[in-house]
């Protein structure tokens, strides 16, 4: 198998929040619907079984009105530490979000891993900015949750 570094988009962001506050935004389907996806996208979540092996079905609504059905399976969940899904339809990938406590908050480590280097390279120009936007939307949702608390 090809090295994971060559077939993954990896990035991280430091959020001024506890791992518990960040995980709350990742584990509540209503909150996930607000931050999931790149800028301009909205989401309808049809099923969100937040447990290892659980199904996650959603439709992402693009800014141009195009609907993108998505099917994923939660592969690993560790409260306040890890959220991992396998995306099953369309482009197959594994997405891992790790929460690392830091003095200034929580570092979110995001890694989207494709099956092959070729698959990743075909999508890299879209994936990189989309993942940056996704993390920015997660950060905004975490802050929104802190204000509401």
Descriptions of predicted regions:
Residues 44-86:
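Glycine-rich portal/gate segments that line the openings of hydrophobic small-molecule binding cavities
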Residues 84-133:
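Beta-strand/loop substructures that line and gate deep hydrophobic ligand-binding cavities in soluble
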Residues 22-26, 32, 56-58, 74, ...:
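Hydrophobic pocket/interface hotspot
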Residues 140-149:
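Short, highly charged C-terminal tails/helix-capping segments
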Residues 1-42:
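Hydrophobic ligand-binding cavity/cleft-lining segments
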């Amino acid at each position: 198998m090809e090295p994971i570094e060559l077939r993954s988009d990896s990035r991280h962001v430091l959020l001024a929040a506890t791992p518990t506050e960040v995980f709350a935004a990742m584990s509540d389907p209503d909150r996930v619907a607000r931050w999931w996806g790149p800028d301009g996208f909205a989401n309808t979540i049809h099923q969100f079984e937040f447990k290892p092996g659980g199904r996650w079905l959603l439709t992402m609504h693009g800014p141009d009105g195009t609907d993108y059905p998505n099917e994923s399976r939660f592969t690993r969940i560790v409260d306040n530490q890890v959220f991992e899904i396998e995306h099953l339809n369309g482009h197959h990938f594994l997405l891992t979000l790790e929460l690392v406590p830091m003095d200034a908050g929580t570092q979110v480590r995001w890694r989207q891993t494709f099956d092959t280097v070729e698959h990743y390279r075909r999508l890299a120009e879209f994936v990189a900015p989309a993942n940056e936007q996704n993390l920015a939307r997660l950060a905004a949702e975490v802050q929104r949750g802190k204000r509401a608390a």
